Structures are given as structure tokens and as C-alpha cells.
Amino acid sequence: MTDPPYPVPRGWLDRYGWAIVRERVTSLVEESRSRIAFLCGSAENEADVRDLFDLIVCLVIDEDTLRHRLATRTTNAFGRHPEELAAALKWNPLMRAIYEGHGATLIDASKPLTDVVDDVVSVADAVREPRGDA
């Protein structure tokens, strides 16, 4: 599955989901050994690749901000259709609970974008700092 149809037909999101291909993520890891790389999103089988990451970050957002951002973004139409919006609102608290359970670093994504980016880069840089084993 790459992208869902737009708008998604009724019940489509209940029947289909996103899956991640381990080989592609492994390739990304190999290609980015000397720099920070980010893989954004979630997939139903993400446990299959979790071991490849040094850090997992969960961007946490309140429902009102999520609604506003989905309605006003220009880079992706997902969330404007009522069924997509309902799915996003349902997934939002579930994702936080799942990632929190995996020890993810939680970042308040309801802040302005530049602040969120600074927070993500800051925690990523902290993981990259030499640990004395060089």
C-alpha cells in the first residue's frame, strides 16, 4: 500500500493499513550512517523495524490543533474527508499511548512548527553525541 484513494471510501481505513518494508528501512540506515535521518509516520508492522532506530520520537498534539492543521495544510489532503478526520482523531490518543509504552521521547507538537523542529533536532543531536567509545 502506498497512498489511499482520495477521498477514502466508507470503511476503507478499517480494512487497509500501512506496512513498512524492513529492507527499505535497512537501506536507509546504511545510507545515513554518517548523519541524522528521520523516518516519519507509523505503520501496522512497525515493530518489525523498531530495533533499527536509535531514538523514537512521538509528536503529541491536542485534538483542536490536530483538527486545525488537517483542515488547513496544503501538502496533503488526508484528514479533510470526514472518514479520514474521524480516523485521525481516533488514532491520535492511541499513538501517544503506544509510543509512550515503547519509551518514545514525547514532544509537544501543538507548539509553533519552528519550536517543534528545534525540539526534535535537539533530542536527535543528544543521541548523536559521542559516548566515549570512539
Regions inferred by a protein language model and the residue ranges of each:
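Small/polar loops that bind or transfer phosphate-bearing groups
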Residues: 40-41, 58-59, 108-109
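NTP-dependent small-molecule kinase module
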Residues: 96-134
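A glycine- and Lys/Arg-enriched "phosphate-lid" helix/loop adjacent to the NTP-binding pocket
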Residues: 50-98, 102-105, 128
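ATP-dependent small-molecule kinase phosphotransfer cores
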Residues: 1-43
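Acidic, amphipathic alpha-helical patches
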Residues: 25, 46, 95
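Short glycine-rich anion-binding loops that position phosphate/pyrophosphate groups of nucleotides
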Residues: 43-45, 62-63
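Short, hinge-like loop/turn segments at secondary-structure boundaries
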Residues: 5-14, 56-58, 75-76, 125
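Short, well-ordered alpha-helical microsegments
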Residues: 44-47, 116
